[in-house]
Amino acid sequence: MVVANIMTPEVVTVDPASSIGTAIALMREHGFRRLPVVKEGKLVGIVTDRDLRQATNSPLVLRERWYSDFLLEAIKVKSCMTPDPITATPATPIIDAARRLRQHKIGGLPVVAADDDRRVVGMVTITDMLDCLIHLLASEDPID
């Protein structure tokens, strides 16, 4: 089985010049914990809910609401994202993707087009892999 069988193809992305407030709003709206960061159609990074919490972990943010709102708009995604993230392609075997997640202690991989243009075509997460495992253990028929 390959990543294409279990990935989420509908990807919500964020621009590196967007505010972290925008990234937080997108994560909340769509229920995601990570967003690929895309500039001019190409993957340049990934930002997670943890990155955003760390970026706003300031005594002023916790104490002063007005300053918190200011920071959410002033701080840009590019300042807290992880550049050049570990990726997979749709043809990557699921076992290889799982090993990457485990080795790098991360929760998800952007899935990029196989032609190496860094165009994001999906996301695959630990949850996707657990769903696959549950399906395989619960049935005789593996996912196509």
Language-model-detected regions and their locations in the chain:
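Tandem CBS (Bateman) regulatory domains
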Residues: 1-10, 48-86, 98-102, 120, ...
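A cytosolic small-molecule/anion-sensing beta-strand core signal
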Residues: 7, 39, 81, 113-116
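The conserved cystathionine-beta-synthase
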Residues: 14-31, 37-39, 87-106, 112-114, ...
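Hydrophobic alpha-helical segments, especially transmembrane helices
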Residues: 34-35, 51
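Short hydrophobic beta-strand segments in globular cytosolic domains
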Residues: 38, 44, 120-121
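Short active-site-proximal "capping" loops at secondary-structure junctions
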Residues: 42-43, 54
